[in-house]
Amino acid sequence: MEIKEISVPQQGVVADYMNGKKEIQSCFDYMLTEDAFKQRVQDLREREFFRQDLVTHLLEYNTKLQAGEATIQNVKALGDENTYVVIAGQQAGLLTGPLYTIHKIISVLQLAKEKEESLGVKVVPVFWIAGEDHDMDEINHTFVTKNKKIKKTIFHDRNPKKASASESELSLEDCRKWIEEIFKTYPETNFTKDVLQFIDDSLRKSNTYVDFFGHLIMKMFVNSGLILVDSHHPELRKLEVPFFKQIVSKYKEVQEGLHNQQRVIKELGYKPIIETKSNAVHIFMEIDNERVLLEDNQGKFVGKDGTYSFSYKELIEEMERSPERFSNNVVTRPLMQEYVFPTLAFIGGPGELAYWSELQQVFHTIGFRMPPVVPRITITYIERDIATDLHDLQLQESDPFFNNVDKLRENWLSNQIEEPIDERFVEAKKEIIDIHKSLQQFVKKIDPGLSAFAGKNEFKINEQIELLERMLKRNVEKKHEVELNKFRRIQFALRPLGAPQERVWNVCYYLNQFGLDFVDRVMEKPFSWNGKHHVIKL
């Protein structure tokens, strides 16, 4: 594996944050400097955490996932007041979801190791599985290449229920068949059998989406020391009850903090992305197997436009009685994370970084400081055949990241032709239509009744010219079919669906191609935190 860094253009909040623009940096409590991380350690030392209760829960949860010894030791270390965490999170995508989930975990592992060495304190890596998520459409699919097209392959569970990812039971047999269908689209390699067995070992131990995700991630990172947490685990929810109560008692201040911070964001020229109602309580409650967002209505806490209604006392009593019924929304999830974990740093993608910039004053209303927000490592993998295609087309490895691949293809094709086809046909159509318009005037003078027919005649002639243009283009493309297929392969591999590779493709393709130690070998590579994109040649 060979690693190379390229500067990929960023936009908006992310670009300005990474470029050190002071205005947007003022929306965060810590800059990404070593002094800021030292200050963060000092700030965390002044706070209290329910460490022992958390350790008890995490030991039980990670042991069930058959965690390695390094993970168990890291969990136990959390009981020490001088241990801190680097954390990131994601939904429980089937087969771990898009590659960026793996890249987030690699980011967490690397930053935790680096900060432990530089700060001289124990820093452990934590990955937060968003088990409360009810949106199965976000996690029930993966993308594959089939018949020279990119296909979204959806897992259709025979017994779908309106439940969270932590509670949604998987039909193991259906899931196994779905996985087999995915692997039929991959080339069979020396690793295929082992990878399928690896996945099936995790599937057999799983009852829910979160189980499957957790087992697969733990198995993939078994020697890394990674700690997993299911955000919707009933035992964790019990530990969170005091903070849920605090949110309910301060929801107006939370909403005001969000509103004020979004006003700051607007004044800086950015567009806020968090949308909430002015009466939002920022907590979900599970009612009749549905996740209902609570709102304030004249002192009552209501859901679904008043279908459900609770007094403050009733809501608090229900939190104490059934904490597993409650979960956070996009505003309070970061707050709950801050309450539970002594967070040295949060690692997020571009979208997360943008919405965290809207939360600074929300953190302050609770008496927290927002942790350092570190953009995750971004990676694209270039296989040998794709590297060869780039070379054959005289393209740089960075070209697909700076230019639309379709545009690169069009430019290349136009360079193979002496005279541009589009321009010549535009000229020809104009000349022919001008002549025909004159002819129509002549016909109209002699026989006005033929005017409509003359107009149709113009349309037919134009149709035939366009047909000739299409046939010429098709023949030119056929002549250069080999090269154009290279462009298609490059696009599918590096910019599938016009998106970054890591947002579409799944890690299982790479495990199948390069073996079960693929992720371990990627983790051995040195990654920088300078905001540049990492290209790994395989």
From Swiss-Prot:
From the record, give the transmembrane residue ranges.
none
Q: Which residues form a coiled coil?
A: 460-484
EC numbers for this chain:
6.-.-.-
Heme among the record's keywords? Answer: no
Name the InterPro entries on file.
Answer: Bacillithiol_biosynth_BshC, CC_BshC, Rossmann-like_BshC
Q: Does the keyword Coiled coil apply?
A: yes
For molecular function, the Gene Ontology terms on record are: ligase activity
Q: Which UniProt keywords apply?
A: Coiled coil, Ligase
Q: What's the stated role of this polypeptide?
A: Involved in bacillithiol (BSH) biosynthesis. May catalyze the last step of the pathway, the addition of cysteine to glucosamine malate (GlcN-Mal) to generate BSH.
Q: Which HAMAP family match?
A: BshC
Family from the record? Belongs to the BshC family.
The name this protein goes by in its record:
Putative cysteine ligase BshC
